[in-house]
Swiss-Prot record:
GO cellular component term of the entry, any: cell division site
Role played: Cell division factor that enhances FtsZ-ring assembly. Directly interacts with FtsZ and promotes bundling of FtsZ protofilaments, with a reduction in FtsZ GTPase activity.
UniProt xrefs under InterPro entries: ZapD, ZapD_C, ZapD_sf
Protein name: Cell division protein ZapD
Lineage: Bacteria, Pseudomonadati, Pseudomonadota, Betaproteobacteria, Burkholderiales
Organism of derivation: Burkholderia multivorans (strain ATCC 17616 / 249)
Major place of residence: cytoplasm
Subcellular location: Cytoplasm
Gene: zapD
Subunit structure, interactors included: Interacts with FtsZ.
Length: 251
């Protein structure tokens, strides 16, 4: 099954983008080649761009505190696995403490680093980080991989509490949903939501069908339409019945 996820609001959309960026960052940071570390560094700049939103930190803290208050009353409940509950609450409380310790504007340490700022300004120009443009950056790229890795890890460190918070919120959202098997008749599916509020929709489709879901929703109804990509042409709507799994997630 291939999993597709669709956010229902801007906050979840931002967290999904952050998750994708941090996963890409971790992958390229673990590599050895300077060109791969260049991708890790430019991804760090993208992360700083997304996390630089003034209200992101406060939004995450409010959501984590809300989840803590929701889960804490279940302590001592015999119907709840207490070890798992304590692990989640401990993770939330530690992440809240780490967020509270973040001082100043998010990502300001990258702005204040003149050398990184010069790389960042050139990185948005196609081919702008050639060795003749940034000889000091080229020299740094010749350092041992582990030394480069340590530098990049140091630069990402102040942003990690936001990664941890986003991870918790997305995990709790995903775990809140229950998958149901449904059928898109002639490639199209609709479902009434009756005014219920959801944050995230997951669509799982059989890999062998080679179909691509396109989704939209409002507070009353959701639509899923399946298309198929064939060569260089735009995806076209399919007219076959498509079985898939639908999960609606609500924090």
């Amino acid at each position: 099954m291939i999993l597709y996820e669709y956010p229902f609001n801007e906050r979840i959309r931002t967290l999904l983008r952050l998750e994708d960026l941090f996963e890409r960052f971790a992958f390229f940071l673990a590599q050895e080649d300077p060109r791969e570390h260049h991708v890790a560094l430019t991804t760090l700049f993208e992360i700083a761009e997304v996390t630089g939103r003034a209200d992101l930190k406060s939004d995450l803290m409010k959501e984590l505190e809300r989840q803590r208050q929701t889960l804490a009353p279940f302590r001592g409940n015999p119907g709840i696995e207490q070890n798992a509950l304590e692990a989640v609450l401990g993770e939330i409380e530690q992440t809240l403490a780490n967020l509270a310790q973040m001082q100043g504007k998010t990502g300001q340490h990258l702005v204040d680093n003149e050398w990184l700022a010069s790389i960042r300004s050139r990185a948005v120009i196609p081919g702008g980080t050639c060795k003749f443009d940034l000889p000091s950056y080229y020299a740094w790229q010749q350092w041992p991989a582990e030394q480069r890795r340590q530098d990049i890890a140091k630069w990402i460190m102040p942003l990690l509490p936001l990664r941890d918070a986003a991870t918790i919120v997305l995990r709790l959202a995903r775990e809140s949903g229950q998958a149901s098997k449904v059928m898109a008749m002639q490639g199209s599916y609709q479902q009434m939501l009756s005014g219920r509020s959801y944050q995230l929709m997951q669509v799982r489709v059989p890999r062998e069908l080679h179909v691509i879901p396109e989704a939209s929703a409002n507070k009353y109804m959701l639509w899923v339409r399946f298309t198929m990509q064939d060569g260089d042409v735009r995806p076209r709507a399919v007219d076959i019945d498509v079985p898939f799994q639908l999960t609606l997630c609500n924090l």
